Amino acid sequence: MPLNRTLSMSSLPGLEDWEDEFDLENAVLFEVAWEVANKVGGIYTVLQTKAKVTGDEWGANYFLVGPYTEQGVRTQVELLEAPTPALKRTLDSMNSKGCKVYFGRWLIEGGPLVVLLDVGASAWALERWKGELWDTCNIGVPWYDREANDAVLFGFLTTWFLGEFLAQSEEKLHVVAHFHEWLAGIGLCLCRARRLPVATIFTTHATLLGRYLCAGAVDFYNNLENFNVDKEAGERQIYHRYCMERAAAHCAHVFTTVSQITAIEAQYLLKRKPDIVTPNGLNVKKFSAMHEFQNLHAQSKARIQEFVRGHFYGHLDFNLDKTLYFFIAGRYEFSNKGADVFLEALARLNYLLRVNGSEQTVVAFFIMPARTNNFNVETLKGQAVRKQLWDTANTVKEKFGRKLYESLLVGSLPDMNKMLDKEDFTMMKRAIFATQRQSFPPVCTHNMLDDSSDPILTTIRRIGLFNSSADRVKVIFHPEFLSSTSPLLPVDYEEFVRGCHLGVFPSYYEPWGYTPAECTVMGIPSISTNLSGFGCFMEEHIADPSAYGIYILDRRFRSLDDSCSQLTSFLYSFCQQSRRQRIIQRNRTERLSDLLDWKYLGRYYMSARHMALSKAFPEHFTYEPNEADAAQGYRYPRPASVPPSPSLSRHSSPHQSEDEEDPRNGPLEEDGERYDEDEEAAKDRRNIRAPEWPRRASCTSSTSGSKRNSVDTATSSSLSTPSEPLSPTSSLGEERN
């Protein structure tokens, strides 16, 4: 099946204000997800970062509904009394009938109100509700699948809550219920089955069957049309889960996915074309470092260098000033996340650097949590040796400084032969002896429980990257999430990313991809693929992604070997960049953070909610998408300072000046003039055209005023703003032809 990329009709900056005429005074939004105040995966990040923008739009009429977990409530939620009489009556009614429902405020930016349903306390009704689910939806749930049983309990409790809230409300409300993922989907199906007056939205962040198929080494994207979905789900013993997901997708008034690539996947696996694509954003303010992100990179890199000094003690025969730090991070899905491709490319990169006599060294980190039982003793010893050497050096330095001070105080130059005594030399020799090491530095920082069958370690043994002195590429596998309290690498994830030079995410299955997005907003170049939602989004909106530090690896139309070769080419060309070029590229990368801000991507969610309201309450709301001229489409321009040929960006002299290497002064251009990133950004923005907003929404009820939200007012700036929700309904049809 051909998977052609199509541009959005109106994309990006310079947009006029969105004249949103929806009156939300009598509308209430409930966002339902298993990961509300309950960190499990990426949906938690979506909800957490989007909460402020959604709260600005809906105000006190915005609520999140999730499961009650003791850990989550203790650390993330402040329990409160219900703020309205209708809500208080709803909670009291449910609690009096054997449920346990809690209300509070989620302690994140925006402070959204949350309703937490205790799933375990309602287990007494599980069998009855499973019977009702079978009678209503013909979906049977086996007793042994605890996660699916929890989904049934959560779905029935959610529907009970929404129905009770509508019954207890004295005025007629227009309720929107937005359900995320299959774990919350049963509630949506029951809302429709019980004919509750609720506008429903279902968002799938990744299809169940797609994730299972890709993990099984299937040629997924070339066979989407050919899968017997019922058979495939049954063979993997997830048929009941698949039915939950598919039923929710078909029952929803509006069905959305997080990326164009997932929209195509949903069309064939869930048998419904998504109405809108709702890309995931980030709270860019959280990562904002003003103009100091270059300095933050240097500070964070210094923390990583300290770890490297300890880890490679005894084999530290490479120059840390000429060392680049690459990393891959995420869930430990060896093939889906592209760790197999990355390792193969590192082996080829190692060969290229060695045969070309490069002085550059690459340290590649794999941050993927796996089953371990403790830290590696050699790794701990390395950090202890490093700290001991540092203490020894400081002791000698203090003694040397004191003698130098005394000598200068009396007006004479010191005798250098007497500055250090025999004890000092003995101390230093002991320190040098402590750095002697017979074995190679360890590849893994922890003791793995299944060392012999671990896919990363098995591949490393095959390709022979053992951190030997001859290798220009070193590998460090850190099978645990990063923490600032770790005795090995005491940095949190954000600080670690800032200190690296390149994030590598060659995923085969990645519906969106928050890791490269986080790199972008922190000004760190990254490699993504055209099979990830993020990669497709950036490829669609940027004329020359690589010039901005966004490298898009082709895994759609290339074989695995060709993809490895292309990734090797990306890595090798990055290693050939000068420090000056990397500084300029980081500036450009950081500028793209505007593309990923919820202030702009939040419009897609707003459009989905307005579409749902118009479908559920057509007598009060209308939603009329207008076709836009394809010529209005816009892609972020190529940077004005990028030369037409890479050869023109090389130095005429093999040596760089100190001015060029100082990020505080800014790098020099080829003619010797100072490079000004703000001036370059202004040039880009002058090229931006302002396409007309392609659709209008309105409210036909007899209310006087309309509620302008902060998301709309933010568009008066000239930052990069997506103009319309990407509707895959037409483009998916084109891709089938």
Curated annotation (Swiss-Prot):
It catalyses: [(1->4)-alpha-D-glucosyl](n) + UDP-alpha-D-glucose = [(1->4)-alpha-D-glucosyl](n+1) + UDP + H(+). Residues 658-681 have a biased composition (Acidic residues). GO terms for biological process: glycogen biosynthetic process. The gene is GYS1. Glycogen synthase participates in the glycogen biosynthetic process along with glycogenin and glycogen branching enzyme. Extends the primer composed of a few glucose units formed by glycogenin by adding new glucose units to it. In this context, glycogen synthase transfers the glycosyl residue from UDP-Glc to the non-reducing end of alpha-1,4-glucan. It comes from Pongo abelii. Part of the GYS1-GYG1 complex, a heterooctamer composed of a tetramer of GYS1 and 2 dimers of GYG1, where each GYS1 protomer binds to one GYG1 subunit (via GYG1 C-terminus); the GYS1 tetramer may dissociate from GYG1 dimers to continue glycogen polymerization on its own. CDD domains: GT3_GSY2-like. The modification Phosphoserine is found at S8, S11, S412, S641, S645, S649, S652, S653, S657, S698, S710, S727, S731. Residues 715-737 have a biased composition (Low complexity). Alpha-D-glucose 6-phosphate binds at H291, E292, Q294, H297, K301, H501, R582, R586. Phosphorylation at Ser-8 by AMPK inactivates the enzyme activity. Primed phosphorylation at Ser-657 (site 5) by CSNK2A1 and CSNK2A2 is required for inhibitory phosphorylation at Ser-641 (site 3a), Ser-645 (site 3b), Ser-649 (site 3c) and Ser-653 (site 4) by GSK3A an GSK3B. Phosphorylated at Ser-641 by PASK, leading to inactivation; phosphorylation by PASK is inhibited by glycogen. Phosphorylated at Ser-641 by DYRK2, leading to inactivation. Dephosphorylation at Ser-641 and Ser-645 by PP1 activates the enzyme. UDP binds at K39, R331, T515. InterPro entries: Glycogen_synth. This is Glycogen [starch] synthase, muscle. GO terms for molecular function: alpha-1,4-glucan glucosyltransferase (UDP-glucose donor) activity. The keyword Cytoplasm does not apply. Its EC number is 2.4.1.11. Allosteric activation by glucose-6-phosphate. Phosphorylation reduces the activity towards UDP-glucose. When in the non-phosphorylated state, glycogen synthase does not require glucose-6-phosphate as an allosteric activator; when phosphorylated it does. The modification Phosphothreonine is found at T700, T721.
